[in-house]
């Protein structure tokens, strides 16, 4: 893996800060890569870390300010998204109360910070507002996981068709990789996911970005056969284009079947290696990776 580690260090775009309010200079090398995207998907390997949520918020600000994205699809709670959309457009309602009643992975100060930033921005630009993407009432929510994946993709497609907005989709890695036959473990559940439907619809206009990490609070270092074990050789926080020019042996590593972390609410650190995504390669699943070496827990709403 030495050659892959050397390539990562040569290609990595170092992040100067994870602070959502930091200047965008270090992100500007991404402009050309993301300029033509219709949907940029920020898929986190865990939705319970401060750093991955902060960098997702930072990328949201960049995409809105620099590349004209005007909708945020916050995966996981359609009712909460509808209330948050009303808040960011009109100021009606209490976003803290909405998120406190939402699904557990949305009950964080980091998500609330992003909501409040959108409202603040919309107040400054009342004629050019950022929206929360809303579920289409004609899309039947699936009961089985395969149906849920189709529904996630269909709602995204219909919102884009309805509004014409470029969309930042903030959700989970398992849903957003381009995974026609990816497997979620434990349980070894294999089915086509939302990201593969979105790639089919938008082609290169769908850009999946993996938000990954090596270790952190109550999470041991990545197993040696996980992609993160190699990604950890890069800077403390960076962006990597998985389709940049690479030597043949590095390209073989990028194209080889791999595993990545996948940490949900039932995660058990004593059985860390069991919680992973498999059934594809980094280069198949993702266009970009944002890797943070060390993470801590998100700040829960009180």
Which stretches of residues belong to each language-model region?
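Structured catalytic-domain cores with a bias toward divalent-metal coordination
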Residues: 1-302
């Amino acid at each position: 893996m030495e050659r892959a580690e050397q390539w990562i260090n040569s290609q990595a775009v170092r992040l100067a800060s994870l602070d959502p309010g930091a200047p965008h200079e270090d992100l500007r090398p991404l402009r050309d890569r993301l300029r033509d995207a219709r949907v940029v998907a920020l898929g986190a390997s865990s939705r319970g870390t401060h750093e991955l949520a902060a960098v997702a918020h930072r990328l949201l600000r960049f995409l809105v300010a620099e590349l004209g994205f005007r909708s945020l699809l916050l995966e996981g709670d359609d009712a909460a998204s509808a209330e948050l959309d009303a808040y960011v457009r009109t100021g009606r309602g209490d976003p803290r109360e909405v998120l406190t009643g939402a699904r557990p992975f949305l009950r964080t100060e980091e998500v609330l910070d992003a909501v409040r930033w959108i409202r603040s921005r919309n107040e400054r630009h009342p004629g050019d507002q950022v929206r929360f993407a809303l579920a289409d009432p004609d899309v039947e929510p699936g009961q089985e996981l395969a149906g849920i994946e189709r529904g996630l993709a269909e709602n995204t497609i219909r919102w884009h068709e309805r509004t014409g907005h470029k969309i930042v989709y903030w959700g989970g890695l398992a849903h957003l990789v381009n995974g026609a036959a990816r497997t979620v473990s434990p349980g070894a559940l294999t089915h086509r996911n939302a990201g593969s439907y979105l790639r089919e619809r938008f082609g290169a206009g769908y850009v999946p970005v993996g938000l990954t990490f090596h270790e952190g609070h109550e999470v041991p270092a990545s197993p040696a056969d996980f992609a993160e074990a190699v990604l950890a050789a890069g800077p403390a926080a960076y962006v990597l284009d998985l389709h940049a020019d690479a030597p043949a042996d590095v390209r073989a590593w990028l194209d080889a079947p791999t595993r990545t972390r996948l940490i949900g609410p039932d995660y058990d650190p004593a059985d860390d290696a069991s919680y992973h995504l498999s059934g594809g390669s980094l280069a198949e699943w993702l266009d970009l990776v944002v890797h943070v070496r060390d993470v801590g827990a998100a700040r829960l709403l009180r």
